[in-house]
Amino acid sequence: MKKVFLFLGVVLSSVLATAQEVEEPEFAGEVVVIRANETTAPLEKQISQSRSVLSTGAILTGIGKYRTQLQIVGCCSTVKLNNGESVKFIVRAVDNNTDPLAIIKIFKFESKPKYRRAEVASTNTFGTTKTNNLSYISFSAKRYGKSSYIITPSVTLEPGEYGITVSNPNAVDEKQTVVSAFAVEK
């Protein structure tokens, strides 16, 4: 009888060991990518800079645009995904009780040799202001673990540089925006 229980214990533990899930990221705001082949990697983390730009037309003639941009240093992310690859992301938040669409943003950057930028807001000379100008990528999300979400982009990501931000719904005044960056190769 002992041998039967021992055998069942070994079989059960081996089944549970192979069904082990990917761990949640350690800190709120961190993001891990799950690739199509089930391998994982933490995304590159960058502290963003806020940048304001006045168009040439506004400088020369007084008519033009004033833009606010989110900028991170470096042309390219160190985390590269293959074009057309099916991916999911595990995003750690403060908790997973908030609608993820309200706190998680996936967006595309404009990449230059020394930086990556995304327009956050713009105002023209005539007073029209647009906010939330980021090129958002839609996604579906489910709760994952104790305080994370597993998110799946709703569209195939085109080649380019991308960022994910996670805001804290409990904090009224966030001082710095941390961007988790990745790239989709051509």
What are these regions (language model features)?
Residues 121-146:
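Extended, solvent-exposed segments with strong compositional bias
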Residues 4-13:
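Sec-dependent N-terminal signal peptides
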Residues 147, 156-161, 165:
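A glycine-anchored, Pro-Gly-centered beta-turn/N-cap motif
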Residues 15-19:
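Sec/Tat signal peptide C-region and signal peptidase I cleavage site
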Residues 142, 148-150, 169:
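Aromatic- and Gly/Pro-enriched, solvent-exposed loop/edge beta-strand patches characteristic
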Residues 20-124, 168-186:
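Primarily secretory-pathway and cell-envelope proteins
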Residues 82-84, 144, 157:
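Surface-exposed coil/turn segments at beta-strand junctions on protein surfaces, enriched
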